[in-house]
């Protein structure tokens, strides 16, 4: 995707401005890690390349994945190959769990959420980040998009209580991201011309995002849920 190339030359403040979803995701994982007791067991379900490991250096971090999502990724940091619908762990052994932009890639999301609930200890918490309006990615393993209501339903059915559920941006941040998406259709000499047309409005639009009060047009959601004691 175009973002991998863009991130290499963007200064930090501009990365946060243009690629807001990515920045919010990183903040959410870092902040979540800060709430977990030192030494506690943490499951990263659908960890991919385990790039969030840096935030859990003081925990017993267990990244698992089925390793079929992207054939360009390096899965060597994964501790176990695991089908998220049947996690290879006893019940109630993790203090916390992550499921970061992974739930759209599973055919049985309810079973996955229920498995996360099963392996959490009473009082344990799970951080989920899910897409709402997003392009197809990691095809053909891309099955679902989620509304706030659908996510609440999945969590409720698994016996989890929602503590936090927040949209990541509104209409104008969504449109900014979509303009950047458009750069991928241009090559050679047409690319700088397209960049001149698409990047300036992409820079301006996020400043208008406060106009969207409901945030029904959003890139995705960050959610924290707890297993009852």
Residue spans for each PLM region:
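Short catalytic micro-motifs in class I SAM-dependent methyltransferases
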Residues: 101-105
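Conserved N-terminal segment of class I S-adenosyl-L-methionine
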Residues: 1-92, 96-100, 113, 218-221, ...
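Glycine/Thr-rich phosphate-binding loops of Rossmann-like dinucleotide-binding domains
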Residues: 51-53, 107, 136
